[in-house]
């Protein structure tokens, strides 16, 4: 980054500091990952200069012959990965992908059935502070009070009672497999559309390690980062019958020109996801998550639903007599990055919470293995149990440093 260093020392310094943070800390935020250098090169390419309103072959600007190739590559690779009939790779985020689906099939005030945010849903699944909860009449379903797994009988009962036009499946903090076939059966029974937000599990689906929602849903949305290990962005997969409507909802509906440099980076990441070693990577994510969950339970920590089927683990910290906010802060102090998170049947404020959400996608990208999960579980428990003991926290910092030093990353940067 010689040019940046000469041009803008302040921004260069901030980026260098962030690189240092990523290298020196254990990244356990479930929605984060480390992209390849190839993905970063594509995102930092000259494609950032190109305006390309419209779609390949139907642009509102000239000079789009090369970016058309890139967007077609991205779309074709997604179709190959997930078996989708139609793909739109232009959404700038998962939230905008969800918005586009809503704008395609809903009118203001329509009833939608979505997962309660504190039970594992997402802001765009009907939270009253989000456009989705403001524009539409969302009815919430949640998890069982004992198992903390989705109660499909409750979903069916609420669907029959409220007759939603759309049912939203998918989550941002749900550690178990979701039965998309069952959701489609419920949707069909009440005459509703089904949209699946697979943002967190897309990489696992791509590797064939989680049920694929595409055969069951009218619409599937996802981010392109998280377990899919691409750049930050979104996309929509849908049945061919909705293709023109979805494309129109994205452009000119809610977006202008697509970010072609990001779409190029998406294409590269999708190419990586088609390789055999990506399947190995995704399996290692799950193996690491299971090992980490087992280690945390051995240390006496409570896990929502008792474990995990995917990359994500939700820790209930109430038995440690601390809050999620305190847990996030003290873990960050020793070099372990997590996020505080609400848990099912939460009583604390979302700014405080009773839980911590962690995931294994990023550490697996870095090369961490099963024995490293044992050490991370020990570190998390040791830190939380000794959160007011500075000597213990200093010991934890040294252990984190020893662990991260074994896995150098982005050495060419």
From Swiss-Prot:
Annotated compartments: Cytoplasm
UniProt pathway annotation: One-carbon metabolism; tetrahydrofolate interconversion; Amino-acid biosynthesis; glycine biosynthesis; glycine from L-serine: step 1/1
GO biological process per UniProt: glycine biosynthetic process from serine; tetrahydrofolate interconversion
Annotated binding of (6S)-5,6,7,8-tetrahydrofolate, by residue: 117, 121-123, 239, 349-351
Class of enzymatic activity (EC top level): transferase
Modification type N6-(pyridoxal phosphate)lysine: residues: 226
One Pfam short name: SHMT
Marked site positions, Plays an important role in substrate specificity: 225
UniProt-listed Enzyme Commission number(s): 2.1.2.1
Swiss-Prot/TrEMBL catalytic activity: (6R)-5,10-methylene-5,6,7,8-tetrahydrofolate + glycine + H2O = (6S)-5,6,7,8-tetrahydrofolate + L-serine
Keyword vocabulary terms for this entry: Amino-acid biosynthesis, Cytoplasm, One-carbon metabolism, Pyridoxal phosphate, Transferase
Essential cofactor(s): pyridoxal 5'-phosphate
Record InterPro entries: PyrdxlP-dep_Trfase (IPR015424), PyrdxlP-dep_Trfase_major (IPR015421), PyrdxlP-dep_Trfase_small (IPR015422), Ser_HO-MeTrfase (IPR001085), Ser_HO-MeTrfase-like (IPR049943), Ser_HO-MeTrfase_PLP_BS (IPR019798), SHMT-like_dom (IPR039429)
GO cellular component: cytosol
Major location category of this protein: cytoplasm
MF terms (GO), sorted A to Z: glycine hydroxymethyltransferase activity; pyridoxal phosphate binding
Subunit relationships: Homodimer.
Membership in a protein family: Belongs to the SHMT family.
Record NCBIfam families: PRK00011.1
Role of this protein: Catalyzes the reversible interconversion of serine and glycine with tetrahydrofolate (THF) serving as the one-carbon carrier. This reaction serves as the major source of one-carbon groups required for the biosynthesis of purines, thymidylate, methionine, and other important biomolecules. Also exhibits THF-independent aldolase activity toward beta-hydroxyamino acids, producing glycine and aldehydes, via a retro-aldol mechanism.
Protein name: Serine hydroxymethyltransferase
Source organism (scientific name): Bacillus anthracis
Lineage: Bacteria, Bacillati, Bacillota, Bacilli, Bacillales
């Amino acid at each position: 980054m010689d040019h940046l260093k000469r041009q803008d020392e302040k921004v260069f310094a901030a980026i260098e500091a962030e690189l240092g943070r990523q290298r020196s800390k254990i990244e356990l935020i479930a929605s984060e990952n480390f992209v390849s250098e190839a993905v970063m090169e594509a995102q930092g390419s000259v494609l950032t200069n190109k305006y390309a309103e419209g779609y390949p072959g139907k642009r509102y600007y000239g000079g789009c012959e090369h970016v058309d190739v890139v967007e077609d590559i991205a779309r074709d690779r997604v179709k190959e990965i997930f078996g989708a009939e139609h793909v739109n790779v232009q959404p700038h985020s998962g939230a905008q992908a969800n918005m586009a689906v809503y704008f395609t099939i809903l009118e203001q005030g329509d009833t939608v059935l979505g997962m309660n945010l504190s039970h594992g849903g997402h802001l765009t699944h009907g939270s009253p502070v989000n456009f989705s909860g403001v524009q539409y009449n969302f009815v919430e379903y949640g998890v069982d009070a004992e198992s903390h797994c989705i109660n499909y009988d409750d979903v069916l009962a609420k669907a029959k009672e409220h007759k939603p036009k759309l049912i939203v499946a998918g989550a941002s903090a749900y550690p178990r497999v979701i039965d998309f076939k069952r959701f489609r059966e419920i949707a069909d029974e009440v005459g509703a559309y089904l949209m699946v937000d697979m943002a967190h599990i897309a990489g696992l689906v791509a590797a064939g390690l989680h049920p694929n929602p595409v055969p069951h849903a009218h619409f599937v949305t996802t981010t392109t980062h998280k377990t899919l290990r691409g750049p930050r962005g979104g996309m929509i997969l849908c049945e061919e019958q909705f293709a023109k409507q979805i494309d129109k909802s994205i452009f000119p509906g809610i977006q202008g020109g697509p970010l072609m440099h990001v779409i190029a980076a998406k294409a590269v990441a999708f190419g990586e996801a088609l390789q055999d070693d990506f399947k190995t990577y995704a399996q290692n994510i799950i193996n690491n998550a299971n090992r980490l969950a087992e280690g945390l339970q051995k240390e006496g920590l409570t896990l929502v639903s008792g474990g995990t089927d995917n990359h994500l683990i939700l820790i209930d910290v109430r038995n440690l007599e601390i809050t999620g906010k305190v847990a996030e802060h003290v873990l960050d102090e020793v070099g372990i990055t997590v996020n505080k998170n609400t848990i099912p049947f939460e009583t604390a404020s979302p700014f405080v919470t009773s839980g911590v959400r962690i995931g294994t996608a990023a550490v697996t990208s870095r090369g961490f293995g099963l024995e490293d999960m044992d050490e991370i579980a020990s570190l998390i428990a040791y830190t939380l149990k000794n959160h007011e003991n500075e000597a213990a926290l200093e010991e934890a910092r040294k252990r984190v440093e020893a662990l991260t030093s074994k896995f150098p990353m982005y050495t060419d940067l």
